[in-house]
A protein has these predicted regions:
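Conserved catalytic or metal-liganding residues and their short signature motifs at active sites
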Residues: 1-186, 201, 217-222, 226-234, ...
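C-terminal, helix-dominated tail/subdomain
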Residues: 184-215
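Active-site-proximal loop/helix segment associated with metal-binding centers of metalloenzymes
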Residues: 238
Length: 275
């Protein structure tokens, strides 16, 4: 940094005298007023400043690798390869949050740290809540991923989670539209149609009862905790409100739900949202 190293010749001479010949890669915070000796000692001893690695709203592991590789030295290919080569890796291990890493973290070290963070996240309290619902942590994350894609309104998440838990208890298909969009791989869909429900996929929760085989995104902490603290009620259906506010209206039976769904369909037609 030209703001710190005022005299390059002086810095190089000091480095030569001290015997500092190699530059070790990393993320270092250089402070104004540092002497050449202070700077060289910091670089030689590898006193890095951690970088904050942030990821959220992630659809899949490939997107995760791309997002993380923008923030540490490891490239997206090495991260993706390391994940695929580790059979013990579950997408659920990567919980969206803000983490601290050294910039020169490699792919294997990144995965190791994320596993440790996953174990830390799933403390005794969360595990006990999952067990009360007869769900494994991985299953909680799968359901949370659906909840996450159903609503952007955090306040609604526990109620929506409660609907799906009620359906699971009855062994009903979840009939979750976001799982169809995931199966189709078309995230431009704004209106799920009957033809979409015919896709042959284990992620089609209209055809297959129970949870899909994996998460449809990396669920947020808010969604995971919404499942673990789901609202207890007698709702089995929900539909987006016809004011298109992003909120939902809930129903206890199919007749009530059909009336709500018809209002929503009319609203979509009014706004010319056909697909």
């Amino acid at each position: 940094s030209n703001e710190v190293i005022i005299n390059r010749n002086s810095f190089e001479l000091t480095a030569k005298i001290i015997g500092y010949n190699n530059i070790y890669p990393g993320h270092y915070l250089l402070k104004d007023g540092m002497s050449n000796i202070q700077l060289i000692n910091m670089l030689r001893k590898g006193f890095q400043t951690p970088v904050k690695v942030v990821f959220n709203n992630i659809k899949n592991l490939e997107q995760l690798a791309g997002r993380v590789s923008d923030q540490i030295e490891a490239d997206s290919l090495s991260i993706t390869t390391a994940i695929r080569n580790d059979s013990s890796i579950c997408p659920c291990y990567f919980i969206p949050n803000t983490y601290e890493f050294y910039w020169n973290t490699d792919a294997e070290s990144f995965i190791k740290k994320m596993k440790a963070e996953y174990e830390k996240f799933w403390n005794e309290t969360r595990i006990a809540k999952a067990e009360e619902m007869n769900l494994k942590p991985e299953e909680v994350s799968i359901l949370a991923s659906i909840v996450d894609k159903e609503t952007t309104k955090t306040s609604e998440m526990p109620r929506i989670a409660g609907v799906y838990l009620n359906r699971l208890k009855k062994h009903w298909p979840l009939q979750a539209d976001p799982t169809l969009i995931y199966a189709l791989g078309d995230y431009s869909i704004h209106r799920v149609l009957d033809v979409h429900k015919e896709i042959d996929s284990p992620y089609n929760t209209y055809k297959h009862a129970g949870l899909p085989p994996g998460p449809i995104c990396l669920p947020s902490i808010a969604a995971i905790d919404a499942v673990l603290n789901a609202e207890r009620h007698k709702y089995f259906y929900f539909c987006a409100k016809d004011d298109l506010s992003g909120y939902h209206v809930f129903a206890r039976n199919i007749n009530e739900h059909n009336r709500n769904a018809e209002k929503y369909r009319r609203a979509l037609n009014k706004h010319k949202i056909y697909k």
